[in-house]
Amino acid sequence: MGLRRESRELALQMLYALDSNASVGPREMLQMFREEQPVSDRLRLFAEELVQGVLEHRPAIDAAIKARSKNWSLSRMPKVDLNIMRLATYELMFRGDIPKKVSINEAIEIARRFGDKDSPAFVNGILDEIPSCAKAEEPDREQ
């Protein structure tokens, strides 16, 4: 398993923990993970970068997921699947340095590992709609 996959999995665990424990804020949660998860600095830094990006852009990320999830409210989605999609959607919408196919494939593989049997297809079905829409929603940078 590659360094970035491990970082994404660690980021998923952080986001899931934040969703599951409203009494702990993001800074405290990141500090807890630093103390309790013995990982390399490179792995931890990319994971924290992903988590901070998701938290910073969460309203836009959740809106993009919600707009593409027919008959599913965010509150009904399994937390693991939702946080996998949040990570990938952050990459798709805000990280031009990561190819869209890579983000989606990584999300599907993480869903296979952490989700249930339906998670990979569910995650893929929603994320597959985001790249073309996210690209259309980006401002024209040449102006």
From Swiss-Prot:
Keywords: RNA-binding, Transcription, Transcription antitermination, Transcription regulation
One Gene Ontology CC term in the entry: cytosol
Pfam families registered for this protein in UniProt: NusB (PF01029)
GO molecular function per UniProt: RNA binding
GO BP term (any one): DNA-templated transcription termination
InterPro entries: NusB-like_sf, NusB_fam, NusB_RsmB_TIM44
Gene3D superfamilies tied to this protein: NusB-like (1.10.940.10)
HAMAP family in the record: NusB
Family, similarity comment: Belongs to the NusB family.
Stated role: Involved in transcription antitermination. Required for transcription of ribosomal RNA (rRNA) genes. Binds specifically to the boxA antiterminator sequence of the ribosomal RNA (rrn) operons.
Listed name of the protein: Transcription antitermination protein NusB
Organism, scientific name: Pelobacter propionicus (strain DSM 2379 / NBRC 103807 / OttBd1)
Annotated gene: nusB
